[in-house]
């Protein structure tokens, strides 16, 4: 079996390592020539996964055609804001009747499309039944080090999810299938916004009680919006919902939590982002969440405050006060 991964950041590289267990060859596409060369000559990605060995079955390339032709499984691991551009360039080389799995956790600014909706918008209908999404609590460094990781793979067509599950199953990587493409994607995207809020609380020194409240009430607003968009509420209590949310709000490797912590300490967002090698998806997703709140009328108070802090310059401490002094409600309001 031959697999392809588009995107040579930390998560794309880690998934290429997973695929290499069951594939004779994995082609990994990346923009950065230095990363491609290092993977091919040193079997390491020193830019994004320094010190972690990459399987010799993984072959990196800057050429999309070389990466895709003849593949039996395609993983799209580009940042959400770059997915449309990359897919437009890759379309001519995408194999037919092969699962295409997106692992990007975002909602496109402006269009408010999830990643599978974006792919449906970009690709001819013949590709649509083969689209899938992989999401769940999965830090790239732990995945690459073959530490136990469990995720959800969702597709409208169960046979596609099962094909992906089989290709990715290893002794240290397990997946569960789902047909709730909507719930899996909203859980994966919006938890990044909530993680920024949790990080801000930590940066402000507000304690464990505050963090637990943000996680719990964050899950409530993610669920409200996801259900409005057609999700099964039970999906949000699973790996791609609560599981990913807890990890991203508490883990030391969380980029979104890091952004929040630095904002809580008073740093400016452009300075924080300038110091980061990889994308914190929650920053852009906060804008999409704000637009979705206005469009749907679903209350997203935590996401709203993150948007105001990240994009309108509001003080993190003032945002906490505003959240705490909102009108009292039933815990199940809006459910």
Swiss-Prot record:
Sn-glycerol 3-phosphate binds at residues 105, 136, 138, 191, 244, 254-256. Pfam families: NAD_Gly3P_dh_C (PF07479), NAD_Gly3P_dh_N (PF01210). The keyword Oxidoreductase applies. Pathway: Membrane lipid metabolism; glycerophospholipid metabolism. Transmembrane segments: none annotated. SUPFAM superfamilies: 6-phosphogluconate dehydrogenase C-terminal domain-like, NAD(P)-binding Rossmann-fold domains. It catalyses: sn-glycerol 3-phosphate + NAD(+) = dihydroxyacetone phosphate + NADH + H(+); sn-glycerol 3-phosphate + NADP(+) = dihydroxyacetone phosphate + NADPH + H(+). Keywords: Cytoplasm, Lipid biosynthesis, Lipid metabolism, NAD, NADP, Nucleotide-binding, Oxidoreductase, Phospholipid biosynthesis, Phospholipid metabolism. Coiled coil: none annotated. One of its GO terms (biological process) is phospholipid biosynthetic process. GO terms for molecular function: glycerol-3-phosphate dehydrogenase [NAD(P)+] activity; NAD binding. The active site is at 191 (proton acceptor). Belongs to the NAD-dependent glycerol-3-phosphate dehydrogenase family. Catalyzes the reduction of the glycolytic intermediate dihydroxyacetone phosphate (DHAP) to sn-glycerol 3-phosphate (G3P), the key precursor for phospholipid synthesis. This is Glycerol-3-phosphate dehydrogenase [NAD(P)+]. It comes from Myxococcus xanthus (strain DK1622). The gene is gpsA.
